[in-house]
Amino acid sequence: MRQVLAAADKEGVRVSIIPFYNDYIPTHPTIDVVGRTKLIDMRATPLDNIGCAMFKRAADIACSLALLLLTSPLMLAAAVGVRLSSPGPVLFRQKRVGKNKKPFYMYKFRSMRVTGTEDTGWSTKEDARKTRFGSFIRKYSIDELPQFFNVLKGDMSLVGPRPEIPFHVNHFKEEIPLYLVRQQVRPGITGWAQVNGLRGDTSIEKRVQYDIWYIENWSIALDIKILLRTVFGGWVNGEKL
């Protein structure tokens, strides 16, 4: 190989090679150098760039602060409605799995009656645990507003794969080979899968495909597109996690 490269350089000819592991190399590989050894990052993403990651985090903080101020009257009304609808706390805290598989507590306005089964699975439209007011705030995703506090804390991002409970993560990682790739970024309040109709009791395999596509193709423009689709119809109706 050295002789071939030397001969090509002598003649001013560019050389391209097909490595024996060609099938595994990503479309846009990132090369790291450790000592004299070159390493190919097999799953590099745009958010690996510290500048991109810092910009996204700064945007999350600024936008979540602004949205908390804008929605504070609505959140106050929701809190009163939850309190009057059924006995129990206003906020529902549920353990979810975040970036790098780190667990955190995600906040929601409580939409169900207090039982011992709220941590076990997804809700459906016919779920008897939901209160009438709870169904209303779920329909318009008002129950998700407290997650702006999760964004401020750094547990979540405005946009990213939706976080799931540890039980589901432990199950799906055995069934879906690329499932844990989702955990390489902060989970989001909304995501590419969700605005494409994959929410609640829908195909997990398709959801993972959309989540990984988002991670590999992240851009500021894509986040803005997802947020706009969320506001103008992508986040209304249907059942959520």
How does the language model describe each region?
Residues 1-3, 26-27, 80, 93, ...:
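Short glycine-/acidic-enriched loop or helix-start segments at secondary-structure transitions
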Residues 1-72:
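N-terminal hydrophobic signal-anchor/signal peptide
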Residues 19-23, 28-35, 92-132, 190-207:
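Short, glycine-rich, amphipathic interfacial segments at transmembrane boundaries or analogous
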Residues 42, 92, 159-160:
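Thr-Gly-centered strand-to-loop micro-motif
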Residues 51-116, 150, 220, 225-241:
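A hydrophobic, helix-centered structural microdomain
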Residues 123-186, 226-230, 234:
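A short, structured surface patch at a secondary-structure boundary
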Residues 161, 197, 217:
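Short, conserved catalytic or interaction motifs in soluble domains
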Residues 212:
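Short beta-strand/loop motif that positions the catalytic acidic residue
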